[in-house]
UniProtKB/Swiss-Prot annotation:
Its main location: nucleus. One of its GO terms (cellular component) is nucleus. This is Dehydration-responsive element-binding protein 3. It comes from Arabidopsis thaliana. Probably acts as a transcriptional activator. Binds to the GCC-box pathogenesis-related promoter element. May be involved in the regulation of gene expression by stress factors and by components of stress signal transduction pathways. Keywords: Activator, DNA-binding, Ethylene signaling pathway, Nucleus, Transcription, Transcription regulation. The keyword Nucleus applies. The gene is DREB3.
Length: 236
């Protein structure tokens, strides 16, 4: 009896344990598959950027398409060598079909995108192709703004330098003392000296005879006697 009891108990224990082991193995397998999918998805997303309406072909090209409004069909936009080109094509088609409610990959380029002539699939494809081959203007605008800011900064620095130089020159000119004119002072002094002083050389006048045509009476006006020469003789 005891042996039968232990055998039945062991069988029941194995029956209870086997399903649990199978379920554990199944759960472990599902977890491993999920983690592998997440890892693969992470590797795939890290290789290239992900854009709305853009898919990658097996041979490395990028395709873009968009669903027509209120229809099950899609508008084929084309195959492109880069994901950015396909994303710009999708943005043009989305703007044409959905308007302001469209979700864009490059919202900053919305104003520069070409517009289709009509909402027909052919016109949308033409506009999308133009947008795909257009050059992005974000880098150009950023470089232009930086260069303009540098030029404005350099012009401001040059203006400040010119102002400093002009201020220095004005200060140096303010320190110069205005001197009187030499010619004017000379004329005034000479006139005053002419009025105050008279030069008279009596010795020269006595030694040299008077000019021709001048009488001896004229010498009286100068205080010279006509017999001045005779007065110098000595009686021996």
């Amino acid at each position: 009896m005891a042996e039968e009891y232990y055998s039945l108990r062991s069988e029941r224990v194995t029956q209870l344990l086997v399903p649990n082991s199978e379920s554990d193995s199944v759960s472990d397998k599902s977890k491993a598959e999920q983690s592998e999918k997440k890892t693969k998805r992470g590797r795939d997303s890290g290789k290239h950027p992900v854009y709305r309406g853009v898919r990658m072909r097996n041979w490395g090209k990028w395709v873009s398409e968009i669903r027509e409004p209120r229809k099950k069909s899609r508008i084929w936009l084309g195959t492109f060598p880069t994901p950015e080109m396909a994303a710009r094509a999708h943005d043009v088609a989305a703007l044409s079909i959905k308007g302001t409610a469209a979700i864009l990959n490059f919202p900053e380029l919305a104003d520069s995108f070409p517009r289709p002539v009509s909402l027909s699939p052919r016109d949308i494809q033409t506009a999308a192709l133009k947008a795909a081959h257009m050059e992005p203007t974000t880098s150009f605008s950023s470089s232009t703004s930086s260069s303009s800011s540098l030029s404005s900064t350099s012009s401001l620095e040059s203006l400040v330098l010119v102002m400093d130089l002009s201020r220095t020159e004005s200060e140096e000119l303010g320190e110069i003392v205005e001197l009187p004119s030499l010619g004017a002072s000379y004329d005034v002094d000479s006139a005053n000296l002419g009025n105050e002083f008279v030069f008279y050389d009596s010795v020269d006048y006595c030694l040299y005879p008077p000019p021709w045509g001048q009488s001896s009476e004229d010498n009286y006006g100068h205080g010279i006697s006509p017999n001045f020469g005779h007065g110098l003789s000595w009686d021996l």
